[in-house]
C-alpha cells in the first residue's frame, strides 16, 4: 500500500496539481489585495468616498453585507480574467509548437540511399540532356 501511495504522490499530475494549488492560493491573495486595497478604494473615491466593505443592509438583527459581496465579485472577475489570459497564452504556445511539429513531419527526410539515388538520377538526366 505504501508503494502504491508513493507512485501516486510522485506522479507528475499530482505534483503539478499541488504546485498549481499553492501558486493559485498565493495569486488569490495578491488579487484580493489588489481589489481590496487599490481598486475598490479608487472606485469608492470616484463614487463619493464610499467604502464598499462597509456597505450593508440591516434586516432585523441580520446584516446583509452586500459591499463585501461586491468586492468578492470584483475579486473573482479579476482572477477569472487572469486565468483566461494565462490559458489563452498556453494554448497559443501549444498551437505554435504543434504547427512546427507538423511542418517537420511534412518535410520528408531522405535516407543516405535515397539521397544517392536522387543524385544518380539527376546526373543521368544531365547526361541525357547534354547528349
Curated annotation (Swiss-Prot):
Query: Where exactly are the transmembrane stretches of this chain?
Result: 8-28, 30-50, 67-87
Q: Name one GO cellular component term.
A: plasma membrane
Q: Which UniProt keywords apply?
A: Cell membrane, Ion channel, Ion transport, Membrane, Transmembrane, Transmembrane helix, Transport
Pfam family membership, one: MscL
Is Transmembrane helix there in the keyword field?
yes
Q: Where in the cell is it found?
A: Cell membrane
Q: How does it sit in the membrane?
A: Multi-pass membrane protein
GO MF assignments: mechanosensitive monoatomic ion channel activity
KW Transmembrane helix (keyword) present: yes
**Where is the major localization of this protein?**
membrane
Summary of the function given for this chain in its UniProt record: Channel that opens in response to stretch forces in the membrane lipid bilayer. May participate in the regulation of osmotic pressure changes within the cell.
Q: How does it assemble?
A: Homopentamer.
The record's similarity note reads:
Belongs to the MscL family.
Query: Which PANTHER family does this chain map to?
Result: LARGE-CONDUCTANCE MECHANOSENSITIVE CHANNEL, MECHANOSENSITIVE CHANNEL MSCL
Q: What is the recorded name of this protein?
A: Large-conductance mechanosensitive channel
Quote the gene name from the UniProt entry: mscL
Amino acid at each position: 500500500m505504501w508503494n502504491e501511495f508513493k507512485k501516486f504522490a510522485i506522479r507528475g499530475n499530482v505534483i503539478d496539481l499541488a504546485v498549481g494549488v499553492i501558486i493559485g492560493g498565493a495569486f488569490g491573495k495578491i488579487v484580493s489585495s489588489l481589489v481590496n486595497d487599490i481598486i475598490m478604494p479608487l472606485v469608492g473615491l470616484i463614487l463619493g468616498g464610499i467604502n464598499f466593505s462597509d456597505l450593508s443592509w440591516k434586516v432585523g438583527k441580520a446584516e446583509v453585507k452586500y459591499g463585501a459581496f461586491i468586492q468578492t465579485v470584483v475579486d473573482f472577475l479579476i482572477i477569472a480574467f487572469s486565468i483566461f489570459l494565462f490559458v489563452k497564452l498556453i494554448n497559443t504556445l501549444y498551437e505554435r509548437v504543434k504547427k512546427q511539429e507538423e511542418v517537420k513531419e511534412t518535410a520528408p527526410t531522405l535516407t543516405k540511399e535515397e539521397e544517392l539515388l536522387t543524385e544518380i538520377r539527376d546526373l543521368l538526366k544531365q547526361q541525357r540532356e547534354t547528349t
